[in-house]
């Protein structure tokens, strides 16, 4: 009997406090671009305008939307894709039990009800990538949508994609995705990793993690499932994901050969690529830069090869003493990618796993190969981003960005942190956010989040929330440092609310309103404390902002500028001191 995953099984929350979902009409009929509007209260009768911010939460925060996971979410891109006239529906490959890592399909696996839908692919001789359209001077609906989200002109979006400086990951089989862009001249993006393992997690939990991560601001998610039900879990996630979904196909290919790396073949891997492309995966991490000649260089490392995909391919290369089949078949992979518009995320299989190994010969040798592969992908008009480290101390971070921009001709950089120290298990979301903020400032386009469970275990829901928020902080700090034209507006609004003691506005304007209110209410839970002109840190007598208010009020009453009021007040206090006898202690 077929099971199902219902909305009742998982926690789906509405919009954040003080916020509402709004839509901006696009230039094409029916195009509605989501935003989150944060309302603000008045200041002495003077209205404070609402603040609109980028929204990744999909329909789940729309009060008018009824969640039905078994049907999937709306498909805003479907008409755009079909309207271009360059795709066709076809039968697709047969879904087999081995796709879920089993020999016989289990009746207990919650099969997605619409698994029989026909996938799309490019018509014979066509190329359906956003890069292909951009290079041919076409501004697609997806590009127009992105331009509204980013606050730029559509032509700027087209040019950045055409030049390879940005990617718009948008598989034609993932029409549910709300278009977004990854590039250093746009907002810095954040990816959240989810996925089951052989020892933990269920399909319902992973769908919930996806909706949870996007609620807190994840711009993309990667399904890194390595346990059973990989295909089915991915189907549930993609059909309900409003953001692009990435995978590492070698993980599933390995499951198909019972976890024995040396039994992997190009044929098994190729079949897996097509399977996932038909489902709608938007970008693939492919470790094609792990070459046979680079593997011995890692022997002198402190932590060797720490990438799962990198170690799998290294083991295969050494066992067969052959070159990496992902490298030798790269042109064929490009042919598959452009049929579905799957973007490359060229994997850093030799990334450093400790600061002792940062910026070493193995890491930068692989980067040279990724630069070579980028040129090949671009020859096919396939979109590319480059994955980066890893564990890198602060003084070595900038070199990574400079080398990537030079070697990979400006392709977007997508980094895991980097972690800036190795001594803080349980706090690696912090050690990595330090590096993430720096490398984002230097030009990284997307940051892969790290949770407190990094190196320790599979993250739960709360870990996902902490990881996403931590990385949204790093990404926003980078946007501010780069001078993004709208980045400071939210900061300015929150600072004004803080100075005016509009506590609820402070909470609502923050990245995590619920956590901010929770911490405030631990010491001042009364409703009256939400309007008090102090908090529990300094109390009523020592609040610096309250004192600043008093100075301004004094200046106003005495018809003085604020600086004059301070000087006058200081003189008055000096006279009081003299009159009291000029004693330091009375």
From Swiss-Prot:
- Give the span(s) annotated as Disordered: 1-33
Query: What does the entry comment about cofactor binding?
Result: Binds 1 [4Fe-4S] cluster per subunit. The cluster is coordinated with 3 cysteines and an exchangeable S-adenosyl-L-methionine.
Cellular component per GO, a single term: cytosol
Reaction equations catalysed: 5-amino-1-(5-phospho-beta-D-ribosyl)imidazole + S-adenosyl-L-methionine = 4-amino-2-methyl-5-(phosphooxymethyl)pyrimidine + CO + 5'-deoxyadenosine + formate + L-methionine + 3 H(+)
Necessary cofactors? [4Fe-4S] cluster
Q: Which GO terms describe its biological process?
A: thiamine biosynthetic process; thiamine diphosphate biosynthetic process
Which residues take part in binding Zn(2+)? 391, 455
Record's Pfam families? ThiC-associated, ThiC_Rad_SAM
Instruction: Supply the EC number(s).
Output: 4.1.99.17
Record GO terms (molecular function):
4 iron, 4 sulfur cluster binding; carbon-carbon lyase activity; zinc ion binding
Biased-composition ranges, Basic and acidic residues, are 22-33
The first-level EC class reads lyase
The residues that the entry says bind [4Fe-4S] cluster are: 535, 538, 543
Keyword Transcription regulation included in the entry's annotation: no
Q: In which pathway does it act?
A: Cofactor biosynthesis; thiamine diphosphate biosynthesis
Superkingdom is Bacteria
Q: What does this protein do?
A: Catalyzes the synthesis of the hydroxymethylpyrimidine phosphate (HMP-P) moiety of thiamine from aminoimidazole ribotide (AIR) in a radical S-adenosyl-L-methionine (SAM)-dependent reaction.
Family note: Belongs to the ThiC family.
The name of this protein is Phosphomethylpyrimidine synthase
Q: Which organism is it from?
A: Bacillus cereus (strain B4264)
Top-level taxonomy: Bacteria, Bacillati, Bacillota, Bacilli, Bacillales
- The gene coding this protein: thiC
